[in-house]
A protein has these predicted regions:
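Chalcogenol-based redox active-site neighborhoods
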Residues: 1-184
Length: 184
């Protein structure tokens, strides 16, 4: 699995971006959001149980990510038509404000090192900085949904470019190593 300090791989994938038939699909590639932070999360399968809870929460907090100049991108190995059908079928997914990328060839999923032995993506999350460097990587067990608020908290911490202690939240004090070393 790729980790902190690695470059995020190049990709060009079809995404479901709308339920309007003439605007439903768009090609998204590694340069689409160049110069922005990206939160790229993978889910195992469409039409499942935990996945829509996570996707809906990323959608609910999308404005918070956008306020931090971060583009949310969701990815699974399902095709774009399955994404479309799922969005249309599931009330919590109909108004998603971010692209659902189709990695049907499993190229990005494999390049990130999150393709499971069962042929589907693991429940992985990456925060990628504007220089395309991974600053955060996490995988949870398939039976455990991720905490999207924690992903946002980590993004906030990364964007301070300062030392953030345990349980730090936006607006809280960061650490000053020089003062701490001096005993102040």
């Amino acid at each position: 699995m790729l980790t902190v300090g690695d470059s995020f791989p190049e990709y060009e994938l079809t995404a479901c971006v709308s339920l309007e038939a003439d605007k439903a699909f768009e090609t998204i590639h590694h340069k689409s959001y160049q110069g922005q932070w990206r939160v790229v999360f993978f889910w195992p399968k469409d039409f499942t149980f935990i996945c829509p809870t996570e996707i809906a929460e990323f959608g609910r907090l999308n404005g918070e990510f956008a306020d931090r100049d971060a583009q949310v991108l969701g990815v699974s190995v399902d095709n774009e038509f399955v994404h479309y059908a799922w969005r249309k079928d599931h009330p919590d997914l109909r108004e998603l404000p971010f692209p659902m990328l189709s990695d049907i060839k499993r190229e990005l999923t494999e390049a990130c090192g999150v393709l499971g032995e069962d042929g589907v993506a693991q429940r992985a999350t990456f925060i990628v900085d504007p220089n395309n460097e991974i600053q955060f990587a996490m995988v949870t067990a398939g039976s455990v949904g991720r905490n999207v608020s924690e992903v946002l908290r980590v993004l906030d911490a990364l964007q301070t470019d300062e030392l953030c202690p345990c349980n730090w939240n936006k607006g809280a004090d960061t650490l000053d190593a020089t003062k701490l070393m001096a005993g102040a």
